Amino acid sequence: MIIYATEVETINSFVRLESLNEVYGLVWIFVPIFSLVLGIITGVLVIVWLERQISAGIQQRIGPEYAGPLGILQALADGTKLLFKEDLRPSRGNTPLFSIGPSIAVISILLSYSVIPFSNHLVLADLNIGIFLWIAISSIAPIGLLMSGYGSNNKYSFLGGLRAAAQSISYEIPLTLCVLSISLLSNSLSTVDIVEAQSKYGFWGWNLWRQPIGFIIFLISSLAECERLPFDLPEAEEELIAGYQTEYSGIKFGLFYVASYLNLLISALFVTILYLGGWNISIPYISILEVFKRNPVFGTTIGIFITLAKTYLVLVISIATRWTLPRLRMDQLLNLGWKFLLPISLGNLLLTTSFQLLSL
């Protein structure tokens, strides 16, 4: 069999083309992921700076001002300091559980960002069960906290881990029932479909007006899931020193703070998507879809800006709540979840189902 030079060149060019396609495929996989992670890190740094400035304003003090202009680099300086601190481990603790606990908490929350639509179809994974994927993944984080508390071999850490697990279970159910009500109104579990269902009717089509009870329950439950005041029982300083974080130092201690702010940001994003219309601007006579059709790049940028503006508005409310309400006792926390929020959210789901059946 004789192979001519032209055939050899054709085969070589085909092999090179296949190799280039594989390289481009890998690039298109990693570039969106890298961009999302970079955006998340920036968002967390902004939240830390915003919380410190709002807290300083409420307490009538100055706040951070030396690290960068207006103290904007203070969070970066604190993270660098924790990075170089010694990583201490309890001598009689369970080292594998102690080491892997913070990583599980952070990774489980990071995976939830894959179903967040920041603009019109600007989402890493547009899944048909996107909203349920978030609920399933977010329920893994308390397991990491419980592992950290148990692996520390410290009574305060163990009690903090148990409190975190009990609190998560108590408020996960009302939150899930509120999400079910939203999915019934939108006839979908996709986060993109939920936003588009709200855009059909403009400002008054937001689920905030169609589900006001669900919005309040979802907001309270998300604050409890984030362990923010008045729901910070797992790390109550007066009772448990620092809860499940007591024995941690260095970068592992910093990972818990990162997980806390990541959880706060993801909760605010889901409030925006489920109840505040997502990327829709909802101004009369101005349709964001028309902007997308005329200039997709400009429309996508505007959509991201609108989503983040609504998200940070929700974050300001969460931060202000921290310095407004006192901490609940553990029995009050569980009673609120099981005796009030759960029955009300179940009744809200039944009412939503009834209205949807009557409208058929």
UniProtKB/Swiss-Prot annotation:
PROSITE patterns from the entry?
Answer: COMPLEX1_ND1_1 (PS00667), COMPLEX1_ND1_2 (PS00668)
EC number(s) per UniProt? 7.1.1.-
Sorted alphabetically, the keyword list is:
Chloroplast, Membrane, NAD, NADP, Plastid, Plastoquinone, Quinone, Thylakoid, Translocase, Transmembrane, Transmembrane helix
As for membrane topology, the entry says: Multi-pass membrane protein
Has the keyword Chloroplast been applied to this entry?
A: yes
Select a single GO molecular function from the record's annotations and give it.
NADH dehydrogenase activity
Q: Which superkingdom, per the lineage?
A: Eukaryota
Compartments, record wording: Plastid, Chloroplast thylakoid membrane
Q: Which residues cross the membrane?
A: 27-47, 98-118, 129-149, 165-185, 203-223, 253-273, 297-317, 340-360
| Reaction catalyzed | a plastoquinone + NADH + (n+1) H(+)(in) = a plastoquinol + NAD(+) + n H(+)(out); a plastoquinone + NADPH + (n+1) H(+)(in) = a plastoquinol + NADP(+) + n H(+)(out)
Q: Which InterPro entries does the protein's record reference?
A: NADH_UbQ_OxRdtase_su1/FPO, NADH_UbQ_OxRdtase_su1_CS
Primary place of residence? plastid
Q: Which GO terms describe its cellular component?
A: chloroplast thylakoid membrane
Q: Does the keyword Transmembrane apply?
A: yes
Biological process per Gene Ontology, one example term: aerobic respiration
The record's note on quaternary structure and interaction partners says: NDH is composed of at least 16 different subunits, 5 of which are encoded in the nucleus.
Job of this protein: NDH shuttles electrons from NAD(P)H:plastoquinone, via FMN and iron-sulfur (Fe-S) centers, to quinones in the photosynthetic chain and possibly in a chloroplast respiratory chain. The immediate electron acceptor for the enzyme in this species is believed to be plastoquinone. Couples the redox reaction to proton translocation, and thus conserves the redox energy in a proton gradient.
Q: Which NCBIfam families match?
A: PRK06076.1-2
What family is it from? Belongs to the complex I subunit 1 family.
What protein am I looking at?
A: NAD(P)H-quinone oxidoreductase subunit 1, chloroplastic
What organism does this protein naturally occur in? Draba nemorosa (Woodland whitlowgrass)
